[in-house]
Amino acid sequence: MSEPASIALQKEIVRELEVAETFDAEREIERRVAFLAERLTSTGLRALVLGISGGVDSTTAGRLCQLAVERARAAGHEALFYAMRLPHGVQADEDDAQQALSFIRPDRVLTVDIKPASDAALDALLAADVAFRDPHHQDFVHGNIKARQRMIAQYAVAGAHGGLVVGTDHAAEAVSGFFTKFGDGAADVVPLTGLTKRRVRAVGDALGAPAALVRKVPTADLETLDPGKADEDALGVTYEEIDDFLEGKPVTEQVFETIVTRYRQTDHKRRLPIAP
């Protein structure tokens, strides 16, 4: 691909994912808190619901949610933030999740163990003679079941309390399609949209999030056979490289091709269902 064409493609992707040329953490906090509060007051809904894992994305989004419901209440609107713990059995980094909750100070904390439902779904598939290529393929599918089960639980809580489910998707995940379709990719509002990973961290820093959580190595941690696998190992590029691409900075040809290939392969994740 010629240099002008590659630059044009990079700019097109940056525009589609709404990554701004300039960034100010305090301004972004105000804009995103105002957005969430306005969605509550304008729709008459009474809750925000978000799963808290202990990573920087949910920690940052969680604090924005709590600030938003407090703002809505100050304006006379009834609203609560429900922070959900959604472990699959025992979570290895549960201490991080609890540290995140201590920082966020949510109105309500609900814990739902997704292991029984997720494992039962896999068992039912196996009982129906659904065949997988190998144990790793089965483990991957099971991981997606876990992600979708978490969203089922969050939507149930939102339905019970007249609320909105909050997603943690941001530009670095969107460009790589690094989320589960109809799992963590399903949400009603996505307050981190347009932020690169380093900008999410900057917002977390500005909010006062614990440094250990802000700098924590990101991991989806969905696969039992490969626990704690870092996002960057799965992606084949680092978040620094993805962020450079999204912020319009030069990257190596290999990084460019890796990002663009993933972007194209995962296009369906960012679209409405295909129709004739």
From Swiss-Prot:
The keyword Ligase applies. Its EC number is 6.3.1.5. It comes from the Bacteria. CDD domains: NAD_synthase (cd00553). HAMAP family: NadE_ammonia_dep (MF_00193). Belongs to the NAD synthetase family. One of its GO terms (molecular function) is glutaminase activity. Keywords: ATP-binding, Ligase, Magnesium, Metal-binding, NAD, Nucleotide-binding. Catalyzes the ATP-dependent amidation of deamido-NAD to form NAD. Uses ammonia as a nitrogen source. GO terms for biological process: NAD biosynthetic process. Deamido-NAD(+) binds at residues 148, 181, 188, 268-269. Mg(2+) binds at residues 57, 173. Homodimer. Pathway: Cofactor biosynthesis; NAD(+) biosynthesis; NAD(+) from deamido-NAD(+) (ammonia route): step 1/1. This is NH(3)-dependent NAD(+) synthetase. It catalyses: deamido-NAD(+) + NH4(+) + ATP = AMP + diphosphate + NAD(+) + H(+). GO terms for cellular component: cytoplasm. ATP binds at residues 51-58, 168, 197, 219. InterPro entries: NAD/GMP_synthase, NAD_synthase, NH(3)-dep_NAD(+)_synth, Rossmann-like_a/b/a_fold.
